[in-house]
Amino acid sequence: MVILSHHKRSPPLLMRLFRICRFFRRLMSSSTSSVESVEDESCSNECSASFTFDTNNNSRGNNQVNELAEETHMKLSITPTRESFSLSQLERIITIGKGTFGRVELARDKITGAHYALKVLNIRRVVDMRQTQHVHNEKRVLLQLKHPFIVKMYASEKDSNHLYMIMEFVPGGEMFSYLRASRSFSNSMARFYASEIVCALEYIHSLGIVYRDLKPENLMLSKEGHIKMADFGFAKELRDRTYTICGTPDYLAPESLARTGHNKGVDWWALGILIYEMMVGKPPFRGKTTSEIYDAIIEHKLKFPRSFNLAAKDLVKKLLEVDRTQRIGCMKNGTQDVKDHKWFEKVNWDDTLHLRVEPPIVPTLYHPGDTGNFDDYEEDTTGGPLCSQRDRDLFAEW
């Protein structure tokens, strides 16, 4: 049994017009060219366009798949960044994200003025959706991870009905929004983002953690335009393989569908899907229904447009190798094989890791708490269903 959640965005027309005006005003004042003008050049020579897109149309439905069976909890060492956070010192401003059993709000520290993303989860809904273990896993994993391309988590709180995760506010919004607005990215743009993702995956895998939910919706842009991987609800520490199906249908690896067990290879498969989607504007395996998407993945009918860069095509084919033992990134040299691929030959990996490469997109921001790059949501005035003491006990150590 699986859960399919559908997420559609549709902000008011005035907000869309406002964002379009911001886009053209900022673009006209920039001396750099637009995103479509970026050609196959070295990452260090990327043109930088500063803008805000309309982030709301043509969503692919965001089908999220997660098997109901709970997974075995794997303990991780936890070193909280800050233990002095409390909800009382945060002013909750506006909702910037919404999910099946929770939402994300922009919050401001009343003392320092700093802005944070506050993830609010309704305990009853988490339990009803049988996501208890995934929520615990996300907290434990995020508190362990410290990397420039991964969103930071600072602390957690709870009250009688909700769980809270105090996280880094990433003001650029989702990569998904920019990709849908521009329809596709140039070869060099896709390579820039892929190189930062490779660094993040290398780090995660070195800790024995599999991400399992790589997709444009989970990739945020920092104020400078660098990648920030978010939403680690499906992340898991693995010693061998796991058998739970989780992720987005378009991005599921064949071994996940076959239930033969999967490991970090699913992240490399997802990277292949992501590179293809960035350059084409849609994932390679498509269908009108989830079943049709699964059939396309299993049949592995991989087609490329004629304009697809040959080196990128070669890498995508190797990332989308059905035999996971032969998939690039999964063999003896691991991530190094990916980094040594000819598509990345112009990438200076040290410069990439240390944020010395200029991003091709710099989000438009007018002040530190600017939420113009996010969708608009109705505020929750009810707080959601009340939970029982039995539900609360599941999060006694939160």
From Swiss-Prot:
Q: Which UniProt keywords apply?
A: ATP-binding, cAMP, Kinase, Nucleotide-binding, Serine/threonine-protein kinase, Transferase
Name the catalysed reactions: L-seryl-[protein] + ATP = O-phospho-L-seryl-[protein] + ADP + H(+); L-threonyl-[protein] + ATP = O-phospho-L-threonyl-[protein] + ADP + H(+)
Q: Which residues form the active site?
A: D213
Q: What organism, scientifically named, is this protein from? A: Caenorhabditis elegans
Q: Which SMART domains match?
A: S_TK_X, S_TKc
Query: Which segments constitute the Protein kinase domain?
Result: 90-344
Q: Which InterPro entries match?
A: AGC-kinase_C, Kinase-like_dom_sf, Prot_kinase_dom, Protein_kinase_ATP_BS, Ser/Thr_kinase_AS
EC number(s) recorded for this UniProt protein: 2.7.11.11
Q: Which GO terms describe its molecular function?
A: ATP binding; cAMP-dependent protein kinase activity; protein serine kinase activity
Q: Which residues form the AGC-kinase C-terminal domain?
A: 345-398
Give me the residues that bind ATP, please.
Answer: I96, G97, K98, G99, T100, F101, G102, R103, V104, K119
Q: Into which family does the record put it?
A: Belongs to the protein kinase superfamily. Ser/Thr protein kinase family. cAMP subfamily.
Q: What is this protein called?
A: cAMP-dependent protein kinase, catalytic subunit-like
Q: Please tell me which top-level EC class this enzyme sits in.
A: transferase
User: Can you list the GO cellular component terms from the UniProt entry?
Assistant: cAMP-dependent protein kinase complex; cytoplasm; cytosol
Q: Name one GO biological process term.
A: cell adhesion
Q: Lipid metabolism: is it a keyword of this entry?
A: no
- Pfam families associated with the record: Pkinase
Q: Which Gene3D superfamilies match?
A: Phosphorylase Kinase, domain 1, Transferase(Phosphotransferase) domain 1
